[in-house]
Amino acid sequence: VEVIDAVRTADLTPDPEACYRALSIRDARFDGRIFVGVTSTGIYCRPICPARTPKPENCRFFGSAAAAQEAGFRPCLRCRPETAPELATWRGTSNTVSRGLALIADGALDGDGSVDQLASRLGVGERQLRRLFDQHLGVSPIAVAQTRRVLFAKQLIHDSRLPMTEIASAAGFGSVRRFNETFQQLFKRPPSALRRKAVVALPEGSVAATG
């Protein structure tokens, strides 16, 4: 309880010592509440990641996957941040931000959607919405939407046999080219390479493995 309270005292900048204690024992209570960016690898992980615990000086802690990705870290291929419980993005947010997150999850910023249109749907100005997101989440609405697209697409790559064109569309990418460019930039490999890696890792008899 003491560790949880210590983390909660700072919504946007979780207490590093408390977070590292949770990371060192892979405390599942923090899954979805915090993410750790490892500066020596450029990867961000869930606190329950099975990889060897990094040194404290190599860790940066974030309250959301979007904040970690905005800081330049890419998602871990082992613990798969896209499967973490969606707790942190809703904790301590205002009603406007919570509604905005729900609309973003529904695709409000996909395709031709803009932050100005999102703000209008929420009944606030664009600048006010950006300020609220920065205040409560530490990132912009666009950053949240971009992270959601990447993590949702990555989940579909791992957990389905859908063609890449359908995954790009379902995740809200404007084009397959943009989809491929984003994954190449983040993971230094095309989406198809992640699909091959996922298929190899699938246990025999799983739904995705058997088609």
Predicted regions mapped to residue ranges:
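Mature, structured domains enriched in cysteine- and short glycine motifs
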Residues: 1-103, 112
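Terminal helix-turn-helix DNA-binding modules in bacterial transcription factors
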Residues: 102-106, 112, 116, 135-172, ...
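Basic/polar phosphate-binding segments, predominantly the helix-turn-helix DNA-binding elements
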Residues: 73-77, 81-88, 112-148, 168-190
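Hydrophobic/basic alpha-helical segments enriched in Actinobacteria
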Residues: 55-56, 70, 96, 121, ...
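Catalytic cores of secreted or luminal carbohydrate-active enzymes
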Residues: 182, 186-205
